[in-house]
Curated annotation (Swiss-Prot):
Protein name, per record: Centriolar and ciliogenesis-associated protein HYLS1
Region (Disordered): 64-106
Record keywords: Cell projection, Cilium biogenesis/degradation, Cytoplasm, Cytoskeleton
Source organism (scientific name): Bos taurus (Bovine)
Gene Ontology CC annotation, any one: non-motile cilium
Localization per record: Cytoplasm; Cell projection, Cilium; Cytoplasm, Cytoskeleton, Microtubule organizing center, Centrosome, Centriole
Gene: HYLS1
Biased composition (Polar residues): 88-100
Amino acid sequence: MAQRRRSFSIGEAVEELVGPDGQKWADMDPEERMLVAAKAFPHICAGHGEGDVRREAQSTLYDPYSKASVTSGKQPAFPAQLHHPHTESNGASEAVSETSQRLRKPVMKRKVLRRKPDGEVLVTDESMISESESGTENDMDVWDLRQRLMNLHFQEDRESPVDVSQKFSLPREYQGISQDQLICYLRREEMGPPAYEQDLIVASRPKSFILPRLDQLSRNRGKVDRVARYFEYKRDWDSMRLPGEDHRKELRWGIREQMLCRAEAQSKPQHIYVPNNYLVPTEKKRSALRWGVRCDLANGVMPKKLTSFPLFPS
């Protein structure tokens, strides 16, 4: 009973939308078609027992961390209407595909503070790109055009060009653009949904990954030993040479080669040692005389009389 009631509600909505013979839908202009399809779309979704398929598909498609995540194994899928484009090819499916939901993109605010090696503080705003409602509506129109073009390419082999031109109708702002120009524009847009800033990141490198900088390695210069600092300065000095400066290492090796090419050095004559008998004048003789007099007095030896020099002159 529930199944019969659901099918009846879907048929009633389609009949009200298209008309008994399809003449009502053909007589409408694009604006009226959009208005009628927007009113009938919730009834058709309720008849299927599903919610807003477009919103669910976009919630899966616009996951900002799905492409940047390393552990995520799920790939973003197209909306459910693109997986089975041949299931609904009547006027109701075309009317549903023309409806564009005015969704506002979610905004995630994220500010990151980083410190440079010189101590400067750098604050970067890594929030997702948020656009106005007009920009969102324009992106949704482009995405809707992509859907219809993909359905058109799938069905153009089965249908004639006249039927395709009758079923595929562009919005008012795209009426003056040819189909080839529109295909080139969509290919230039890479046939994908509106991209966020997070979608531009390589999947193998998350946004939270920061590449190490070489100048940060010399931040703890006080902990480096003197030998490493000497070689660092020497490498910097060798890399920045003055114009016209001689390479001292090459000059030294050249002089060393010249020294090795010479003959053996002549031997110097040996020094002949000559003994020196010079006696430095000191008090050694006087002290020796005193020591002799003391020894004679201790032994009771009388000193010799000097006959030539009388002790007591007359």
